[in-house]
A protein has these predicted regions:
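Alpha-helical transmembrane segments and their immediate juxtamembrane cytosolic regions
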Residues: 1-379
Length: 379
């Protein structure tokens, strides 16, 4: 993993990518506790507690993308040709696999209720082959509860499409314009909250116009720019950086946890997911604080052990494949661990380790067995 301006590998970024990947798996391991009502209230508590801890995962990925790829040193056509197929083709392939699983449970004679365990956010499960084929046909356009995590790949392709244009502006190195953009982006992060406090349509939004004043500065592009800016190491003392990072993360977490917990009392995923996840939105001030805290501390980690460097490099190579397939294994692993009676936090931790180990091993095996085709299977 290298930057465009420096061929030296950034091992702290490899470590950060590993942390973000484990956070994604942990977040999805607690889906089963958050998506549906729990008989044990402690399961609900741990679902919210752990889920809130993991919200910076996707923003961290976006920040690393900006750090590593901006500014782009190739033509837009070359960038698109090299980057987009390695996301789009595996996304289509694995989405099809996910959509076939419910049908396969029916073929195997399993009860439909098992689908809800495997895919907690699919509230209308079906074992019909026709529904599976319909979902596969819609892959280029949308996703559903069977492929919850694939939303990120649609978003990532959008960032890739934007980056050549974004890069041309970033290369000008105009600090005033950069700071202004970030300020407007920060304003856009408050919109979900303002829509609940003031009115659902703000700054020109209405039935015939969904593009309000701050629309053009909103979304994950701000994380790209933030990662690019933070690529330059700051000379603040390490102790102060750690203190600042911890403070940012904890303050953001308090808002994220208390906000979600208060919403969970009033709403459910099936009734109003947009309200329930109001404080869990990735593009929100509180999650930015959490991501920024982790990023600043990770940036100061110096990894000198050749063995650890090699391990992190191998882990990074398999990270995209791990992301693609991890959701398949979470449900079965939790089903196997639940009868053991482990405390919920321990069950989640064990699930994360097992799922990551399985996915990493399978991805590494695909790279070894199919070296030429692997890039189109696991990225």
């Amino acid at each position: 993993m290298t930057t465009n301006s420096n061929t030296q590998r950034l091992y702290w970024v490899d470590l950060l990518r590993l942390v973000a990947m484990l956070m994604v798996i942990a977040a999805h391991c607690v889906d089963i506790y958050n998506a549906t009502p729990q008989d044990d209230p402690m399961n609900s508590f741990w679902g919210v507690f752990i889920g809130s801890l993991m919200r910076p995962s996707v923003p961290l990925f976006a920040m690393m993308t900006g750090l590593l790829l901006l500014p782009i040193r190739e033509s837009a056509a070359e960038f698109y040709k090299r980057r987009i197929p390695r996301v789009l083709i595996p996304m289509v392939l694995w989405s099809a696999v996910y959509y076939l699983i419910p049908w396969l449970t029916g073929v195997a004679g399993l009860d439909k209720s098992v689908i809800t365990t495997l895919f907690p956010f699919e509230f209308s499960p079906s074992q019909e082959a026709g529904d599976a084929l319909k979902n596969i046909g819609l892959i280029p356009f949308t996703f559903n509860g069977y492929t919850t995590h694939m939303w990120y790949l649609y978003m990532l392709i959008g960032l890739y499409l934007l980056m050549p244009f974004f890069s041309a502006w970033v290369e000008k190195r105009d600090s005033t314009m950069t700071n202004t953009y970030l300020l407007l982006w920060l304003c856009s992060l408050t919109l979900p909250y303002l829509k609940q406090l003031i009115a659902p349509n703000l700054f020109g939004e209405c039935a015939w116009n969904e593009f309000g004043t701050f629309y053009y500065f909103a979304g994950f592009a701000g994380y790209l720019l933030l990662g690019h800016i933070l690529a330059r190491r700051h000379h603040m003392p390490l102790r102060r950086i750690i203190a600042m990072g911890v403070m940012l993360y904890i303050s953001g977490y308090i808002i994220t946890y208390t906000g979600y917990a208060s919403m969970a009392v009033q709403y459910s995923y099936e009734e109003a997911p947009e309200l329930l996840e109001l404080f869990w939105q990735f593009c929100s001030p509180n999650v930015v604080l959490m991501a920024l805290g982790i990023f600043l501390v990770a940036q100061r980690i110096n990894i000198t052990s050749p063995r650890l460097q090699s391990l992190l490099a191998a882990t990074t190579r398999c990270s995209f494949g791990t992301y693609l397939m991890h959701y398949i294994f979470i449900g079965p692993v939790i089903l196997l661990l639940t009868p053991l009676g482990m405390p919920t936090p321990l069950c989640v931790m064990a699930s994360v380790i097992i799922v990551f180990g399985i996915c990493w091993s399978l991805t590494a095996l695909i790279y070894k067995a199919l070296p030429r085709a692997a890039r189109y299977i696991v990225g």
